[in-house]
Curated annotation (Swiss-Prot):
Pro residues compositional bias, start-end: 130-139
Gene: PMAI
GO BP annotations listed: lipid transport
Name of this chain's protein: Probable non-specific lipid-transfer protein
Family membership: Belongs to the plant LTP family.
Length: 139
């Protein structure tokens, strides 16, 4: 696990952007952000990185939190492991990756038809099981 100092040094080139002094993050900023994103795969790593970034944000009071959250987008980091970080947020919450919601069984296997659906009505009108007529009785 990287130390806070190493993480913050990797992100130092981002300072002019997150302070609003530059319109785009530099290549050095994006390089550091991509490296940090690649090293925050587990919950504890994300919590540690969040706490380090928060400490840096408190040290440099002129950092714009909105610009911090834009770094991944500007640097082409898709599906960043770290959520936008705010100085006041509880970093322990970034250690939990939300589970993807499960679809109801009915949606996993196609649409469910209801009484007003013509397909449903057609199924009701034709019998599902065909029973042959009884054989004529012999007299």
């Amino acid at each position: 696990q990287e130390t806070c100092g190493t993480m913050v040094r990797a992100l130092m080139p981002c300072l002019p952007f997150v302070q609003g002094k530059e319109k785009e993050p530099s290549k050095g900023c994006c390089s550091g952000a991509k490296r940090l994103d690649g090293e925050t795969k587990t919950g504890p790593q994300r919590v540690h990185a969040c706490e380090c970034i928060q400490t840096a944000m408190k040290t440099y009071s002129d950092i714009d939190g909105k610009l911090v959250s834009e770094v991944p987008k500007h640097c082409g980091i898709v599906d960043s492991k770290l959520p936008p970080i705010d100085v006041n947020m509880d970093c322990k919450t970034v250690g939990v990756v939300p589970r993807q919601p499960q679809l109801p069984v009915s949606l996993r296997h196609g649409p469910v038809t209801g009484p007003s659906d013509p397909a449903h009505k057609a199924r009701l009108e034709r019998p599902q099981i065909r029973v042959p007529p009884p054989a004529p009785e012999k007299a």
